[in-house]
Amino acid sequence: MAWLHKLLLTMISVPLKWLVKVNSIPTDIATELGIDNTKPIIYLLRTHSVTDQFALKMSTNSLGLPKPSEPVQIGGKELPACLFLQQPRSLLTRKVKITKIADDVTRLFQLHREHPELDLQIVPVSIFWGRAPGRKLSGWSDIIANQVSPNWLRKFFIVLFLGRDNFVCYSKAVSSRTMADLKGSDEEIGHKLIRLAGTHFHRRRQNLIGPMLLERQELYNAVLGADSVRQAVSDEARSKKQSNHQIQAKAKKYVDEIAADYREGLVRIGDRLLTKIWNKVYNGIEVKHADKVRALAQNGHEIIYVPCHRSHMDYLLLTYVIYHEGLVTPHIAAGINLNFWPIGGILRKCGAFFLRRSFAGNKLYTAVFREYLELLFNKGYSVKYYPEGGRSRTGRLLPPKTGMLAMTLQGLIKGINRPVSIVPVYIGYEHVMEVSSYLKELKGTDKKKESFFQVFSAVRKLKNYGNGFLNFGDPINLSNFLDSEVPDWREAQNLEPDKKPRWLTPAVNTLANDVMGRINQAAAVSGMSLCAMCLLSAKKHAMAQDELERAIDDYLDLLKAAPYSDLSSIPELDGKALVENTLKLNKLEVSQDSFGTIISLKRKNAVALTYYRNNILHLFALPGLVSAIVFAHKGLARPQVISLVGQLYPLLQRELFIYMSHEEAMNYTDRLLSTMIDIGLLRAEDDTLCPPAATSKAFYSFWLLNRSIQETLQRYAAVLTILKKEQTIGRGRLEKQSREFAERLAALHGINSPEFFDKNVLSTFIHALKDNELINASSEGQLQHSDTSEALLASVEELISPEITQRLQQI
């Protein structure tokens, strides 16, 4: 009958080629799953379906895997290349019939007894048509909803309407030799394999499609019926002298304001639309480390995505990537400012839930929101929220807002019934469409309220935006985190279950800083960010093209030989190709003279490009500081260089969210020094580290590194000088005076970086001084100059230019 099956597959292949578009997950099966396409493969599918086999055939052709239609030859015997757990349902009954897989598997293991060298790869393959999670109340749309083993008539409609949304998901191969060597008879081993396969297919479906959607009334009952919400209703009714019914209606309105209303059909439409937009706007979207997240999902974790926030495009890009990586589309926390017609309704149906900027004083709203969030966690929906609370206007990570993280930890404490992992996500662009409006806001212009016309205007202006980058960071298992930070947290909570734990706030603060460090740990370096860093460090923001290309090559060599982390991504292109690609973005100016090509910043773009430089500033903070130290001292012994780096590192770590501990940073600095010597960015003379010879080609790259850290050091010097002058000063007044003087320095010395006098950056630095005990604090909370801050100021002043030092004396 094999020939008849093959004939049928051939006959239907013509219409199916037009109807079916296959998405293979993952695409790099050799690296992620360890599948070797040179070894015999048997594919294990859930349902014996001709259309599923056709989709599998299309996928294997694109991945270079053996064809599922060709039998596997073993010792002169033929084995089918596909095994199936179930037959399709019949038209008249809902009963699912089992295939003869038990006999096939038993025969396979019997062959192992006859051929000891035999080792087949059994690869489970899950095939999905559409990704509708389903509802408890059925409707007409359920006719085409993908289900386990549908009958042939339903499968016809499924392929007809959902053929373009086919997903072929491969899992790690099972070694038939390993299975055959297990204890037990061939029949027992075969039954074990079948049982495990059934469980695996169920979990794989949950990982891709997610849990069943809640009906609205079920949502109301779950949230409004929670003890905390009922208590909040009673308290508010008592305080406002209204009936419980009135406050209950108010709480119900809060649920409607907050809750998502997910519609898989709209997500599919959005996928098609976004694919066209990405193809028009971006040269490519580079995604790294998605395998880490798939592994978490496969192990049953509740996944919470915490990305950095650069642009409104983040909402779309991350969800799009998650969808195409074969993961459940998350419910997304969005600011209430985005809940305007018609965008709010569209976002809500794509999984967005809305939150107010502040919950302060509104205990009822807080209770409703917290219960809704915990409901999402407990039902198994993945969630995405932005720890910064808003978009970064400078390109740096903002200090984290801890409210959502605190609610997440509180949900875990109350008892989420599966492991919870936070996944940091780094998102980077070579062009952010809002940068011009960010600069206006930094100059004091009021932020424009989001509207449909604003969105329409932005879409109309879409053009070449270069590349987009999305790197998944190192996940944080929250139970393990709490076990490390608060070993007795379970016992403490059991003793006082209704009270907020005293350890919660410090634990949340530690978690928040860890999250931000892990986001930056997964940073993506781009041609745009490298060009911006070099040109902004150059005098008059101009460089010869060959100098720019050489500097970029030097920095790429540095990052490859001494990588900032294993999770950060570095371009594979060389400096010349990166400069050529960056010029196509039309942000740089090119001019010619008799000596060659000069590349400079357009006057209108000079400030805007600080945004892209700031995306990667943390990767070059330590190389820049090393260069500044060696340059200022005109040579220094290695231990002294490391000592000076160690003195300033806690401040850089706090400001730039560098993930390394102090010890790790010192070890990394030592490695950097060796690498910089190897590639010519430093010169070793006996025990002294010196700048490269001024005549060497590497000197300019070294000098630019020194310049890249200067604005940070100048800002440090300004704050410390004001503190020295005042001796004792309030934190608010110190921040205000520091900002005013930084603005003056920027005006007098042509510093075009908005973050040079940004209040968040200055506030973070002053907090870091206090937390690291580099300044004193009086009992009244006043900040005080100290011997330690005096020594720190002296070290910093040695590293900055004399003209800036002279200007500081005028304070």
Swiss-Prot record:
Provide the E.C. number(s) assigned to this enzyme.
2.3.1.15
- Which is a GO BP term held by this UniProt record? CDP-diacylglycerol biosynthetic process
- List GO terms (cellular component aspect): plasma membrane
Specify the protein name: Glycerol-3-phosphate acyltransferase
Q: What reaction is this protein's catalytic activity? A: sn-glycerol 3-phosphate + an acyl-CoA = a 1-acyl-sn-glycero-3-phosphate + CoA
Q: Which domain of life is it from?
A: Bacteria
| InterPro entries on file | GPAT/DHAPAT, GPAT/DHAPAT_C, GPAT/DHAPAT_LPLAT, GPAT_PlsB, Plipid/glycerol_acylTrfase
Q: Which UniProt keywords apply?
A: Acyltransferase, Cell inner membrane, Cell membrane, Lipid biosynthesis, Lipid metabolism, Membrane, Phospholipid biosynthesis, Phospholipid metabolism, Transferase
Family from the record: Belongs to the GPAT/DAPAT family.
The membrane topology of this protein is: Peripheral membrane protein
Q: Name one Pfam family in it.
A: GPAT_C
Query: Which CDD domains does the UniProt entry name for this protein?
Result: LPLAT_DHAPAT-like
Q: What is known of its domains?
A: The HXXXXD motif is essential for acyltransferase activity and may constitute the binding site for the phosphate moiety of the glycerol-3-phosphate.
Q: In which pathway does it act?
A: Phospholipid metabolism; CDP-diacylglycerol biosynthesis; CDP-diacylglycerol from sn-glycerol 3-phosphate: step 1/3
